[in-house]
Amino acid sequence: MAGFTMSLNLLLLVAMVATNILSLYHLSSTTNFFQSTVKSSQSSVPTVPDHLLRQLHTIRAAINHLTTHQPDKSTSTSTSRAAVSSSSSSTAPKELLIYSKLSPIASACHNYPDLLHEYMNYTPFSLCPSDTDLVEKLILRGCHPLPRRRCFSRTPRNPSDSKPESNVLWSYYSCKSFDCLITKFSDLGFDLSLEKSKSQFSAYKSELDLPISQLLQIAKSANSVLRLGIDVGGGTGSFAAAMKARNVTVLTTTMNFNAPYSEAVAMRGLVPLHVPLQQRLPVFDGVVDLVRCGRAVNRWIPVTVMEFFFFDLDRILRGGGYLWLDRFFSKKVDLENVYAPMIGKLGYKKVKWAVANKADSKHGEVFLTALLQKPVAR
């Protein structure tokens, strides 16, 4: 900064000397002119030499440039401080930084070079490696959409509608059949029969239940048509299958955590969206009539991410659409102090709000079933 100031002062000094020389030259030329005018009225006015004018313009341009672009001391000081501390701090809101780290965005791929290198280490124009687990590791760490590859995805050798097991690559999973999954995970919906799906959402055993027939009646009474929905964390697509039988199209978001959830959804003739809960839903604004949040949406999601998630649901819901929280799990104190106020920020109408204690609760855990309707106009 001191060198810059010295250079500026030197230029100003040179400019001042040159200006004085030019002024003296011009003054002497003007005096000679008046003297010659007395002697002869026909004498012509002498002009300033071009090389002096060019030098003067050059000096003035340099002075203007330096004075115009000279950085303000306070600005330069703050800029230098920001440059020094950029690696340790930021002026961006903390919640935005948290979300940028947790929410899957493609730019996060560079944060995991080892996993990314392993994912992209394949032979072009051949079969893709068996790396389903690696894919989900990258997705959950923010590397989604995944980089494109020039290899062919693996498929079952002899798929058959009559044999559900033949539609799954079982090498990824501990169980090797749907019977194993039904026995090991009886409550996760791997019984793909339609009657099983219908019965799961038709019974009313407690205040936490919301049968589909009641849901459709509520919508009909409000003159609200249900045509398109999304089941967030919908597992094997049981809810989507039950709604399909009632001519309602429901997309299911799911992840294959040690079981073929996406394959199970597809075998029902439904669409599985292989996305985590943190991702912005790949759906246009204001086009969905219903969003159901299953048991995957609960208190284990970080609070800040949960708030972004709710507002993304609001983004895709149309005015008059419904948000259904089906057995949202949390501690009672957290529901009252954190989640209920967070949900209240949406400004939705409470059509149903039922809270019940967890049967074997030891720390005050509760379940919430809520049906909320988005305002028609903000």
UniProtKB/Swiss-Prot annotation:
Q: Which domain of life is it from?
A: Eukaryota
Q: Which residues cross the membrane?
A: 7-29
Spell out the disulfide connections.
none
Which Gene Ontology MF annotations are present?
A: methyltransferase activity
Provide the topology term for how it sits in the membrane: Single-pass type II membrane protein
Q: Give the enzyme's main class according to its UniProt record, as a single word.
A: transferase
Positions annotated as glycosylated = N247
Positions of the UniProt region annotated as Disordered: 67-87
| Ranges of biased composition (kind: Low complexity) | 74-87
Q: Does the keyword Hydrolase apply?
A: no
User: What is the first-listed, main subcellular location in coarse terms?
Assistant: Golgi
Pfam entry (one): Methyltransf_29
Q: Which residues form the signal peptide?
A: none
Annotated PANTHER family = EXPRESSED PROTEIN, S-ADENOSYL-L-METHIONINE-DEPENDENT METHYLTRANSFERASE SUPERFAMILY PROTEIN-RELATED
Q: What is this protein called?
A: Probable methyltransferase At1g29790
Instruction: Tell me the organism.
Output: Arabidopsis thaliana (Mouse-ear cress)
Gene from which this protein is expressed: CLSC5
